[in-house]
Amino acid sequence: MLFRSAALSIANVKDCDVKIAMGIHAGDHAIYPDCRQEFRDADYKAFTEGNWDADRVGYFTPYLETDKLGILKDGLVLCQKLGLEFDEVYSRTNTSYKPFPSGNSDYKSASSVERIEAFIALGRPDPVQYEDETGPVAWEVARDSVAKVLAEYDA
C-alpha cells in the first residue's frame, strides 16, 4: 500500500502515469498468496476503487510466470545488452529473508535455497556473499548445503 500511495502522489504531482515494478515470480505463488495474479487483481481493484485517479498507477510484473532460473537467464541477457557485468550486478542483490547483521545472505531459508538452486541450475556460482552462524562461507559451502537439502527433498 505504501508503494501505491507514493506512486499515486508522484503521478498526481508530475501529471504522469507510474508503473510499480514487482519481482514476484512463479516460485512465490505457493508460499506467498499475495504473489498470485488473483490477489494482485483484487488488490488493484480495491486501490482503484478507493482512490481518485488511481488508474494512473499500474503494476509491472514481468516474472509472474517465471521461476528464479528464468529470471537469472533473463538477467544474463540483459546484462550483456546493457554492457554490465552479471556478477557485479547480482553481487549487489539479496534474496534472503534472514540476512545477517553484516548484510550477508543466509543459505538455509527458503528464499535463499531457491536462489542457490537457480544458480546451480544455471551452472554459475552465486556472486553474493553467504554466511552462517560461524561467519562468511564460500559459495561451495552454500551450494553443497542446498544440494543436500534438494537431494533429501527429492528422496
Question: For each predicted feature, which ranges?
Answer:
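Nucleotide-activated chemistry modules centered on ATP-dependent adenylation/adenylyltransferase
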Residues: 1-155
